[in-house]
A protein has these predicted regions:
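Conserved N-terminal alpha-helix of the aminotransferase class I/II PLP-enzyme fold
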Residues: 1-49, 71-78
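Active-site loops and adjacent core secondary-structure elements that bind or stabilize anionic groups
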Residues: 249-251
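Conserved PLP-enzyme active-site core in the AAT-like
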Residues: 37-242, 247
């Protein structure tokens, strides 16, 4: 027991924070992404919350976009604000504005790789350059584009946040979230795994990990069909005279 609860045994000891099924799932995602570390959570919002708890503190600010999922926006601008974290909500497609906004108190630059629902796309390498110049991570919610389809690390992303409820789960069988860490800021991963997963109670359930491990096997094939169907639908809608505009990134 002493070995287990001190963390020296390397074996699972308490299923709310370590479980072999969840660990297997994390390792599969790690292999698929080339990440340094992966942490699985019980929802996408749980993953995002843990990342912000790891990088931000009172007096810090998060440089982010005005376009994103509503609950994420509320987390940054309302919930974290109660703990003294400032939200700098700007246009991340305006690189000059980003340069002006990042300062010595910035904790990170955070964005959705494709914004929900506006489908706005920012220049990731430029944002990474600005973030790294200040010594802070670029954190991207990449839920809209599965990690099988692009290399976030090559674009300068330090940490990916994913709602695995979406494409990975696929069949609406389970909820989940992932933090995919590429190792450029190892202190973030240490804080998540050694403190936040223990204290915030947001660890993924073994059943969800099992279902999403199965989902990984068909993710690439399913996404290609979904993307093809979506493009066909968008083109059809665009051809209708009753519709003035179709906001779809692939058109």
């Amino acid at each position: 027991m002493v070995e287990a609860f001190s963390g020296r045994s390397g074996e699972p000891d308490y299923s709310r924070v370590t479980n072999p099924t969840v660990t297997f799932y994390e390792r599969k995602v790690k292999e698929m992404t080339g990440a340094a570390s992966v942490s699985a959570f019980n929802s996408g919002m749980a993953a995002i919350t843990n990342v912000f708890m790891a990088v931000a503190a009172k007096g810090k600010n998060i440089v982010t976009s005005k376009h994103m999922f509503g609950n994420t926006f509320a987390l940054i601008t309302r919930t974290l604000a109660r703990f003294g974290v400032e939200a700098k909500v700007i246009d991340l497609t305006d690189i000059a504005e980003v340069e002006r906004s990042v300062d010595a108190n910035s904790a990170c630059i955070f964005l959705e790789i494709v914004t929900n629902p506006q489908l706005e796309v920012a220049d990731l390498p430029e944002l990474a350059r600005i973030a790294h110049k200040q010594g802070i991570p670029l954190i991207a919610d990449t839920t809209f584009i599965p990690f099988t389809e692009f290399d976030a690390r090559a674009l300068g992303v330090d940490l990916q946040v994913v709602s695995s409820t979406k494409y990975i789960s696929g069949g609406a069988t389970s909820l989940g979230g992932l933090v995919i860490d590429y190792g450029t800021f190892p202190e973030i991963d240490r804080l998540i795994k050694n403190e936040l997963l223990f204290n915030l109670g947001a660890y993924m359930t073994p059943h969800a990990a099992y279902m999403q491990t199965l989902g990984l096997e068909t993710l690439d094939a399913r996404y290609k069909v979904q993307a093809d169907n979506s493009l066909r639908l968008a083109r059809m809608l665009k051809s209708l005279p009753q519709i003035k505009n179709v906001g779809y990134i692939a058109l």
